From Swiss-Prot:
The keyword Transmembrane applies. It holds the Pfam family Yop-YscD_ppl_3rd. The keyword Transmembrane helix applies. This is Yop proteins translocation protein D. Keywords: Cell inner membrane, Cell membrane, Membrane, Plasmid, Transmembrane, Transmembrane helix, Virulence. It comes from Yersinia enterocolitica. It is a single-pass type II membrane protein. GO terms for cellular component: plasma membrane. It is found in: Cell inner membrane. Required for the export process of the Yop proteins. The chain crosses the membrane at residues 122-142.
Length: 418
């Protein structure tokens, strides 16, 4: 069974939302909440529920949850259709398909969970006597129990630290708890699955705790959402090696935009420590390529043809020019990676010292592309001929092959070389 809830005050009054199964968080922090509420009275993590087919249970809340005016203990299965309050948050839920009430009748007076009966003086006296006996008994056992508690606590802390030493929690820090205070765990995890596993481990050991963890996946999604909202659709966001850092790749049109992205994300994404900004300025690759061609003395030997993510250098190649091109290509790749890719097109026929002997009769661009050579045999991509030529790629306009450490582009015209 699935469940749907409705809110009855604030900016989201009248909004109905179907609740996802599993751990469900209501709050104002978009990186920690499944259902984001933007009212100023809502805490970053305001209400935590566990949703399944049987119903909805209270897991945690920033303020006491009241059901029809009565406080609800943690772990309680909530009743559908009742008035539910968590501070400013006023809501209810029903099964999907059932009608939700248009308004909620909020109890004007809070009742005690149980009715209290008048106590007689004899009852009070017996209660005081029982309390004194209990305190005496606890005083006798107190020292031994406290020492045993300390020993158990040390063992549990050792187990927790062993868990935090694993790869999934290597960026989580445990602050040793003081007496009467919950354990504080801060740092970074990969995703919410790691958070839930850690939470279940601590709860199973009966440890009072407070998690102040940031999910790296939530950081990535938050940064991606902000960039797309601002129109930076050409930027890809990925996780950097360091905890709390993100890596950006792609293109923007101006240098000022690249500089603004870093400060923008660090201001808008909670928990983000820094950005490895590898964003390129559109057009810089072509300017740099022209400078490299001049630097290596190839500016008069090649013509440049840009095809999206591919840049072709066309010209006659000899061994000396090929060596210079290889150095140029290595420098270009170090600065810009494989996007765009440089490709050398030798328009001067076959190389003098490395005869290819590669005559294309026809090509097929079906599900498995292949070429037909002058021996009437079919060769797919990846095939190696007897003379050592490897077929790297088959395109409509060209076949790319390699021999030794050299690559060649054989231009086609209607499936035949030209």
């Amino acid at each position: 069974m699935s469940w749907v809830c409705r809110f009855y005050q604030g900016k989201h009054r009248g909004v109905e939302v179907e609740l996802p199964h599993g751990r469900c968080v209501f709050g104002s922090d978009p990186l920690q909440s499944d259902i984001v509420l933007s009212d100023s009275e809502i805490a970053p993590v305001h209400l935590v529920l566990m949703v399944d087919e049987e119903g909805i249970r209270l897991t945690d809340s920033a303020e006491p949850l009241l059901q029809e005016g009565l406080p609800v203990p943690l772990g309680t299965l909530l009743r559908a259709g009742t008035c539910l309050e968590v501070g400013f948050l006023l809501w209810t839920f029903v099964a999907v398909g059932q009608p939700l009430p248009e308004t909620l009748q909020v109890p004007t007076q809070r009742k005690e969970p149980t009715d209290r009966l008048p106590r007689s003086r004899l009852g009070v006296g017996l209660g005081v006597l029982s309390l004194l006996l209990l305190l005496t008994f606890l005083g006798m056992l107190g020292h031994g129990l406290w020492r045993e508690y300390n020993q158990d606590g040390q063992l549990v802390e050792q187990e927790v630290r062993r868990l935090l030493a694993t790869a999934a929690y290597k960026d989580v820090v445990l602050t040793s708890p003081k007496e009467g205070e919950p354990w504080l765990l801060t740092g970074y995890i990969q995703d919410n699955h790691a958070r839930l596993s850690l939470q279940n481990f601590l709860e199973s050991h009966g440890i009072p705790f407070r998690l102040e963890l940031r999910s790296m996946e939530e950081l990535r999604q938050g940064a991606e959402f902000i960039l797309q909202r601002l129109g930076y659709h050409g930027i890809e966001v990925s996780l950097a090696p360091q905890a709390g850092w993100l890596q950006l790749n792609g293109e923007v049109s101006e240098e000022i935009q690249k500089q603004k992205i870093d400060s923008l994300l660090q201001a808008e994404v909670p928990g983000l420590l820094g950005v490895e900004n590898k964003v390129r300025i559109a057009g810089n690759q072509r300017k740099r390529l022209d400078a490299l061609l001049e630097q290596f003395g190839l500016d008069s030997d090649f013509t440049v043809n840009v095809k999206g993510e591919l840049i072709e250098l066309r010209g006659q190649v000899n061994d000396e020019k090929l060596s210079s091109f290889n150095q140029l290509q290595q420098t270009f790749r170090q600065e810009f990676g494989n996007r765009p890719k440089l490709e050398l097109v030798n328009v001067g026929g076959q190389p003098q010292h490395d005869e290819l002997n590669f005559e294309v009769q026809a090509i097929s661009l079906g599900k498995v592309p292949y070429v037909v050579l002058d021996n009437h045999q079919r060769y797919p991509e990846g095939a190696i001929l007897n003379n050592g030529v490897r077929i790297l790629a088959i395109r409509r306009d060209a076949v790319i092959v390699s021999k030794g450490k050299r690559e060649f582009v054989i231009q086609l015209n209607g499936g035949k070389p030209r």
